Amino acid sequence: RDWYIWSDTDPGNGWHQGAQGYYYGFFWSGMPDLNYTNPEVTAQMNNVVRYWLDDIGVDGFRIDAAKHLIEDGDQRENTPATHDWYKKFYAVYKTDHPNAYTVGEVYGAGGFIAQTYTDQLDHVFNFELASGFVNSANGRSNTGINSAYTLTLKNMLEGNFATFLTNHDQNRTMSVFNGD
């Protein structure tokens, strides 16, 4: 039970009725959030990471919805506890695998938000830049890509762009590009 987040009463959005009270599942009822404040959960996640790196031989990880790891009351994203957890996580796998690579999906992240993760993840996807690329390719204003690129150059470490066009939570590029 302590591996998940529970409440005896219904705190509201994101909480779902279970057999033993209400459990927290930010995205939907079929995906309850793990309780990353529980040291057992953290230890098991570290074991999982080591398994994939040591036994399977992967080169790194893509972390979905990275900003939604640990909630603090009504604050559901980018909490200090989330950043603290990632700092420790980063140290765990980088110690034995310094070349392992992690990229985080931090929806809405541009250059400024990405700065807050530089000591926690190798990169975060730059959503502002992606939106600018798509809008410019569709013949819309180039000001979006210009400002996103300028902010990226100003706020990101050199070469830390983590560019993409769209992802699994968005319409795919073939359906968003006009014409070609």
Regions found by a protein language model. Give the residues of each.
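Active-site and adjacent substrate-binding regions of carbohydrate-active enzymes
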Residues: 1-180
